[in-house]
Amino acid sequence: MKILIASSHGYKVRETKAFLKKLGEFDIFSLVDYPSYQPPKETGETPEENAIQKGLFAAQTFRCWTIADDSMLIIPALGGLPGKLSASFAGEQANDKDHRKKLLENMRLLENTIDRSAYFECCVALISPFGKIFKAHASCEGTIAFEERGSSGFGYDPLFVKHDYKQTYAELPEAIKNQVSHRAKALVKLQPYVETVLANHLLAGKESL
């Protein structure tokens, strides 16, 4: 069964590929394989809206089942920022390091610098080319470190320390992060839907013989 990972980010692609390979035989490809593809601009207010927006566009473009996700980092002391601006906090053309730098600058301006609680919200969606949508949500609570730590991961990983851990996401081995992150939790919740779609695909194949 052919399935697209609607991302060109190496870390996300590796994580999702590893998840799919545990579930069955898939012909997996991603947006890395299509460098000229132009994804839609993310205009959603929530991770669910963005995941569905990205997934529907890709599924209809490539005419196959698609997995898409979106995450937002929310810091209550900053009024919910970066929130829907998580991917563009320091500007549309800024990179991950720029976003982290701006976040730390904002944290230093707080009257109460002790309150560094934060959480990630994530939605992962499985979408057919005909608009059938399955979705799963997950979140991860933690705190924002005072400085960047670690060299793996991406985005805000060098700043986010999950509750019950002392390391930032970027300091955790990739195999561990792929078990405890918000995206990993959402993928686990999505698993029954992926298995059902695969089973139906295999059944349809047998009936056509």
From Swiss-Prot:
Its EC number is 3.6.1.66. Substrate binds at S7, S8, H9, G10, Y11, K12, S71, F154, G155, Y156, D157, K177, H182, R183. GO terms for cellular component: cytosol. The keyword Transport does not apply. The keyword Nucleotide-binding applies. Gene3D superfamilies: 3.90.950.10. Keywords: Hydrolase, Magnesium, Metal-binding, Nucleotide metabolism, Nucleotide-binding. It is an enzyme of class 3 (hydrolase). Pfam families: Ham1p_like. GO terms for biological process: nucleotide metabolic process; purine nucleoside triphosphate catabolic process. It comes from the Bacteria. InterPro entries: dITP/XTP_pyrophosphatase, ITPase-like_fam, RdgB/HAM1. The active site is at D70 (proton acceptor). It catalyses: XTP + H2O = XMP + diphosphate + H(+); dITP + H2O = dIMP + diphosphate + H(+); ITP + H2O = IMP + diphosphate + H(+). Binds 1 Mg(2+) ion per subunit. Its cofactor is Mg(2+). CDD domains: HAM1. One of its GO terms (molecular function) is dITP diphosphatase activity. Mg(2+) binds at D70. Pyrophosphatase that catalyzes the hydrolysis of nucleoside triphosphates to their monophosphate derivatives, with a high preference for the non-canonical purine nucleotides XTP (xanthosine triphosphate), dITP (deoxyinosine triphosphate) and ITP. Seems to function as a house-cleaning enzyme that removes non-canonical purine nucleotides from the nucleotide pool, thus preventing their incorporation into DNA/RNA and avoiding chromosomal lesions. PANTHER family: INOSINE TRIPHOSPHATE PYROPHOSPHATASE, INOSINE TRIPHOSPHATE PYROPHOSPHATASE/HAM1 PROTEIN. Homodimer. Belongs to the HAM1 NTPase family. This is dITP/XTP pyrophosphatase.
